[in-house]
Amino acid sequence: MAANSSGQGFQNKNRVAILAELDKEKRKLLMQNQSSTNHPGASIALSRPSLNKDFRDHAEQQHIAAQQKAALQHAHAHSSGYFITQDSAFGNLILPVLPRLDPE
């Protein structure tokens, strides 16, 4: 138990050190950005939040795609119907495909 808690303490210290280093580097970049407002590199720092948002959106889409795949596999395994993955206004991950029958 003591070895486990000391390992967690080391991990926490390591995380704190990494976060402190990132914060320090962020401040340094912000200071450089403020001092050189006419520099073309300044636009790179301003576009960075959109990159983070794009990365987050991509990760979300991958997660949804994995959920859709799992739902599709489950539906195919437990049903004789046919299903497709499609975005739904109601939040459904998969939709059943219903054939149109000619009225008799």
UniProtKB/Swiss-Prot annotation:
Disulfide feature: none
Record note on quaternary structure: Component of the SOSS complex, composed of SOSS-B (SOSS-B1/NABP2 or SOSS-B2/NABP1), SOSS-A/INTS3 and SOSS-C/INIP. SOSS complexes containing SOSS-B1/NABP2 are more abundant than complexes containing SOSS-B2/NABP1. Interacts with INTS3; the interaction is direct.
Cited function: Component of the SOSS complex, a multiprotein complex that functions downstream of the MRN complex to promote DNA repair and G2/M checkpoint. The SOSS complex associates with single-stranded DNA at DNA lesions and influences diverse endpoints in the cellular DNA damage response including cell-cycle checkpoint activation, recombinational repair and maintenance of genomic stability. Required for efficient homologous recombination-dependent repair of double-strand breaks (DSBs) and ATM-dependent signaling pathways.
Alphabetically ordered keywords of this record: Acetylation, DNA damage, DNA repair, Nucleus, Phosphoprotein
Cell compartments where the protein resides: Nucleus
Modified residues (N-acetylalanine): 2
Annotated protein name in UniProt: SOSS complex subunit C
Record-listed Phosphoserine modification sites: 50
Family of the protein in this entry: Belongs to the SOSS-C family.
Any GO BP annotation: DNA repair
Coiled-coil segments on the chain, per record: none
GO cellular component: nucleoplasm; nucleus; site of double-strand break; SOSS complex
Origin species: Homo sapiens (Human)
